[in-house]
Amino acid sequence: MRPSKRAANELRPLSFTTQFTRYAEGSVLVTLGNTKVICNASIVEGVPRFLKNSEQGWLTAEYGMLPRSTHSRMDREASRGKQGGRTVEIQRLIGRSLRAALDLKLLGPYTITIDCDVIQADGGTRTAAINGSCIAMIEALRHLQRKGILQTDPLKHKVAAVSVGIYKGVPVLDLDYAEDSNAHTDMNVVMTDNDAFIEIQGTAEGDAFHAKELDALINLARHGIKQIIEKQQEALS
């Protein structure tokens, strides 16, 4: 029995609140069970120096957790003077995942910056951030289209992410903190809306896992991501 009493293939309650903040071109509050993340997409004209004269746009992401998003307060990374390795890893994952959704040539000389701020963490913050950021990014692209800046939509695919793992010997979907901290295997999967993989991150925390278990986890992830993409579409319609 899972701590949340969910079935093995059951997602936590998931919702997206669009236009959550006033000023960003795209803004979403994603709620995944007790995990809550604000995802804002901002657009500026210009691209990083390494893309000068490349005739393509760029997307980058930043990720952070509020000091009391967890059970006990943690210092802001700014007060420590540097980002932690986990933060850097997650924001790179978000950026890679969303760039895979875009034709950057069609974006033109613009940079989209995604800001993900975790306001409450109960496992799955990186996957929730990707799911909310995809919607915020699409809202930002629609903003450019309404202004007549983009003539062709650069969006190739929606993207979504979910965690899977082996908890008490059973493959389960969408781990919360209680499960994640006790899982034998933990995996994050990012996919497109045409059933293609962007990233698979998997680690055995105790016993090694076998190909049969890997297949079960991948199938669980595909099942969950299909539902998440349906929720994204509902939020955007």
Curated annotation (Swiss-Prot):
Keyword Nucleotidyltransferase: yes
InterPro entries: ExoRNase_PH_dom1, ExoRNase_PH_dom2, ExoRNase_PH_dom2_sf, PNPase/RNase_PH_dom_sf, Ribosomal_Su5_D2-typ_SF, RNase_PH, RNase_PH_bac-type, RNase_PH_CS
UniProt record, GO biological process: rRNA catabolic process; rRNA processing; tRNA processing
PROSITE patterns associated with the record: RIBONUCLEASE_PH (PS01277)
Record Pfam families: RNase_PH (PF01138), RNase_PH_C (PF03725)
Enzyme Commission (EC) number: 2.7.7.56
Keywords: Nucleotidyltransferase, RNA-binding, rRNA processing, Transferase, tRNA processing, tRNA-binding
Amino acids binding phosphate: R86, G124, T125, R126
Record-linked Gene3D superfamilies: GHMP Kinase, N-terminal domain
Catalytic reaction annotation: tRNA(n+1) + phosphate = tRNA(n) + a ribonucleoside 5'-diphosphate
Database matches in SUPFAM superfamilies: Ribonuclease PH domain 2-like (SSF55666), Ribosomal protein S5 domain 2-like (SSF54211)
Top-level lineage group: Bacteria
GO function term, MF aspect, one: tRNA binding
NCBIfam families: RNasePH
HAMAP family: RNase_PH
Family recorded in the similarity comment: Belongs to the RNase PH family.
Described function: Phosphorolytic 3'-5' exoribonuclease that plays an important role in tRNA 3'-end maturation. Removes nucleotide residues following the 3'-CCA terminus of tRNAs; can also add nucleotides to the ends of RNA molecules by using nucleoside diphosphates as substrates, but this may not be physiologically important. Probably plays a role in initiation of 16S rRNA degradation (leading to ribosome degradation) during starvation.
Assembly: Homohexameric ring arranged as a trimer of dimers.
Protein name per Swiss-Prot or TrEMBL: Ribonuclease PH
Organism: Coxiella burnetii (strain RSA 331 / Henzerling II)
